[in-house]
Amino acid sequence: MLVYLAEYLTQFYSGFNVFSYVTFRAILGLMTALMFSLWWGPKMIARLQLMQIGQVVRNDGPESHFSKRGTPTMGGLLILAGVFISVLLWGDLDSRYVWVVLFVLGSFGLIGFIDDYRKVVRKDTKGLIARWKYLLQSLAALLIAVYLYASAQSPGETQLVVPFFKDVMPQLGGFFIVLVYFTIVGSSNAVNLTDGLDGLAIMPTVMVAAAFALIAYLSGHVQFASYLHLPYLPGAGELVIVCTAIVGAGLGFLWFNTYPAQVFMGDVGSLSLGAALGTIAVLVRQEILLVIMGGVFVMETVSVILQVGSYKLRGQRIFRMAPIHHHYELKGWPEPRVIVRFWIISLFLVLLGLATLKLR
């Protein structure tokens, strides 16, 4: 929004031209989202406490989590508000990339909000019925997938980039829709499964978003894209604003979500942030790279799949409890140790993912 004002004022004072640079606006976007979260966080937490919107803890969960019962939840609204305000202020609102991610954040955030509402207000520990949640996620993801396929403006927008291989970028054709669907829905649910300990999900989300900010900048720059053998995506640079807004809002939220948490993000945060990461990966054509950099999310999801599959097929469980972070809790690891070690793994995987841009 302020881009247009700065563009108008540039004719009177050339210094306003600095707002035309994506990097400058990205820094402002990060700072805006961060400061908003830090400023509004205590007010939101107090409001949630007043409304008695507290975390519902299942009786079959780890005993150490019983003390978390009643901790304010739905803090993901703070993250979403920070991202939306920051992007609307500093982003180029003529960019379809920006609106696609905002739509995904809003739609999946609404699904998560309904789920949280049923849990904390109506006291239904199961929340939104699983089939309805999956149906709503599928509708939103398919809508985006079809739109991106129909509105593709260059061949690079529907290619699959394969890490470690320089010129292997096959055209996907109609399979593009299938890939987009599974990337968005899968990423959304993976982050949701990871959000089980204080700060466990938000820090890897911040790391992956920061990495995608760099990738989006490179993909939107014709010379860097050519040098690194990435598909050149005109206008993708505006995704940098979205990514840094997620980083800023996420760090601000972590201030209150770090152990012991004062607030949880709830499904309104985890479902929307996961879907946003999947959408950004799709837009910059790095779905495979998301699997690498978001390895912690993948690990958590696979642990659940293996646990359920093993129990149904063999009647035996592989882990003491799934997702896998609960397995380590039941082994006696203190919660902060599990969290920080998963953060370290996430940092390593993000750096590995970025290294693949050059290792071709």
Swiss-Prot record:
Catalytic activity: UDP-N-acetyl-alpha-D-muramoyl-L-alanyl-gamma-D-glutamyl-meso-2,6-diaminopimeloyl-D-alanyl-D-alanine + di-trans,octa-cis-undecaprenyl phosphate = di-trans,octa-cis-undecaprenyl diphospho-N-acetyl-alpha-D-muramoyl-L-alanyl-D-glutamyl-meso-2,6-diaminopimeloyl-D-alanyl-D-alanine + UMP
Record field: transmembrane: 26-46, 73-93, 97-117, 132-152, 168-188, 199-219, 236-256, 263-283, 288-308, 338-358
Any one GO MF annotation of this record: phospho-N-acetylmuramoyl-pentapeptide-transferase activity
Known cofactor(s): Mg(2+)
Gene Ontology terms describing biological process: cell division; cell wall organization; peptidoglycan biosynthetic process; regulation of cell shape
This enzyme's EC code(s): 2.7.8.13
Gene Ontology terms: cellular component: plasma membrane
Domain of life of the organism encoding this protein: Bacteria
Major localisation: membrane
Localization annotation: Cell inner membrane
Pathway: Cell wall biogenesis; peptidoglycan biosynthesis
Topology with respect to the bilayer: Multi-pass membrane protein
Keywords: Cell cycle, Cell division, Cell inner membrane, Cell membrane, Cell shape, Cell wall biogenesis/degradation, Magnesium, Membrane, Metal-binding, Peptidoglycan synthesis, Transferase, Transmembrane, Transmembrane helix
Role: Catalyzes the initial step of the lipid cycle reactions in the biosynthesis of the cell wall peptidoglycan: transfers peptidoglycan precursor phospho-MurNAc-pentapeptide from UDP-MurNAc-pentapeptide onto the lipid carrier undecaprenyl phosphate, yielding undecaprenyl-pyrophosphoryl-MurNAc-pentapeptide, known as lipid I.
Similarity remark: Belongs to the glycosyltransferase 4 family. MraY subfamily.
Designated name of the protein: Phospho-N-acetylmuramoyl-pentapeptide-transferase
Biological source species: Shewanella halifaxensis (strain HAW-EB4)
